[in-house]
Amino acid sequence: MSCPVIELTQQLIRRPSLSPDDAGCQALLIERLQAIGFTVERMDFADTQNFWAWRGQGETLAFAGHTDVVPPGDADRWINPPFEPTIRDGMLFGRGAADMKGSLAAMVVAAERFVAQHPNHTGRLAFLITSDEEASAHNGTVKVVEALMARNERLDYCLVGEPSSIEVVGDVVKNGRRGSLTCNLTIHGVQGHVAYPHLADNPVHRAAPFINELVAIEWDQGNEFFPATSMQIANIQAGTGSNNVIPGELFVQFNFRFSTELTDEMIKEQVLALLEKHQLRYTVDWWLSGQPFLTARGKLVDAVVNAVEHYNEIKPQLLTTGGTSDGRFIARMGAQVVELGPVNATIHKINECVNAADLQLLARMYQRIMEQLVA
């Protein structure tokens, strides 16, 4: 199958860009963008490669994505080596095919076609690309956004190419994401012998009523755009491994995926009040990895919906479900942010794959979005 989008996707897959190693992917993208008149600014931080590229001026539409991928797992379980792209029955296999090298290829090819047809486009077209989205994300998009904000860079619209679709490309568009807040909580007791409990203070016993009450809380009921806030215990650890020692500490890690009905401060206040109610001795550490954001119906959402309806003849669902994405950082710039990408059924899995025809369709959708906003 010969197609510019498929060929570029295959070139990217062949580069084993395990986060945060870019493995030459960005050099390939930069070469293509510079060839059509983009100015490229490399913005590397520590071990992470990033770039910000732009063409034109005025109202700005940026396409954002990441070149890094997660580890492939056991390569012997793949139907072909994970970094050797292979097409079988119309499906393109390879690590990163769906998440998200296919989207990157579709973006670049769409830009090439758009510039060829609109060499004097009235708005500014931009790219924000990082090599660290899948791992810590500490030196990726967030650092680029901070640098752009410090110099008052303009960003009106941003399309993130994360694999948003469920069954066919464009059936789901993400116009927001929930916030994510993690609590690392240590309950302090006194270690001792299980035969002499009066000489110890068991933190597991002390914390049990607190945990029961915590998991029973209905944090909110969500709203028109967001499901109800969810709290899940992710890790819980105590004890020495011996059956005759009362542990001295209990560690509990729990995560909130929260809607716009709550703030992270409201969650913290409620958890701390509950700890005090149960008279626990504790230390606590919070990690806020992202605030919730929502892009309401407007020029970007309308352009994305129009592109999907035009090429796939379906009306996409606008959802805020799922995990976090780099859109949470970009939203800080005041931009309208939407995610549109391929089907996500196999992302991070053995035999990750994407329908090759979907990538061609995605490039056409991306081009139509460009034409509506910055032509």
Swiss-Prot record:
**What is the uppermost EC class here?**
hydrolase
**Coiled-coil residues:** none
Where do the annotations place Zn(2+) 2 binding?
A: 99, 134, 348
Can you quote the record's cofactor note? Binds 2 Zn(2+) or Co(2+) ions per subunit.
Q: Name one Pfam family in it.
A: Peptidase_M20
> Which key words are in the record?
Amino-acid biosynthesis, Cobalt, Diaminopimelate biosynthesis, Hydrolase, Lysine biosynthesis, Metal-binding, Zinc
The UniProt entry, under CDD domains, shows:
M20_DapE_proteobac
Q: Which cofactor does it need?
A: Zn(2+); Co(2+)
Query: Which residues of this protein are catalytic?
Result: 68, 133 (proton acceptor)
Q: Name one GO molecular function term.
A: acetylornithine deacetylase activity
Using the chain's own numbering, where are the disulfide bonds?
A: none
Q: In which pathway does it act?
A: Amino-acid biosynthesis; L-lysine biosynthesis via DAP pathway; LL-2,6-diaminopimelate from (S)-tetrahydrodipicolinate (succinylase route): step 3/3
Catalyzed chemical reaction(s): N-succinyl-(2S,6S)-2,6-diaminopimelate + H2O = (2S,6S)-2,6-diaminopimelate + succinate
The Gene Ontology biological process annotation of the record reads: diaminopimelate biosynthetic process; L-arginine biosynthetic process; lysine biosynthetic process via diaminopimelate
Q: Where does Zn(2+) 1 bind?
A: 66, 99, 162
Gene3D superfamilies this protein is in? Answer: Zn peptidases (3.40.630.10)
What EC number is given for this enzyme? 3.5.1.18
Per the record, the similarity remark reads: Belongs to the peptidase M20A family. DapE subfamily.
Quaternary structure annotation from Swiss-Prot or TrEMBL: Homodimer.
Q: Report the protein's function.
A: Catalyzes the hydrolysis of N-succinyl-L,L-diaminopimelic acid (SDAP), forming succinate and LL-2,6-diaminopimelate (DAP), an intermediate involved in the bacterial biosynthesis of lysine and meso-diaminopimelic acid, an essential component of bacterial cell walls.
In its UniProt entry, what is this protein called? Succinyl-diaminopimelate desuccinylase
Q: Which organism is it from?
A: Escherichia coli O6:K15:H31 (strain 536 / UPEC)
**Organism lineage:** Bacteria, Pseudomonadati, Pseudomonadota, Gammaproteobacteria, Enterobacterales
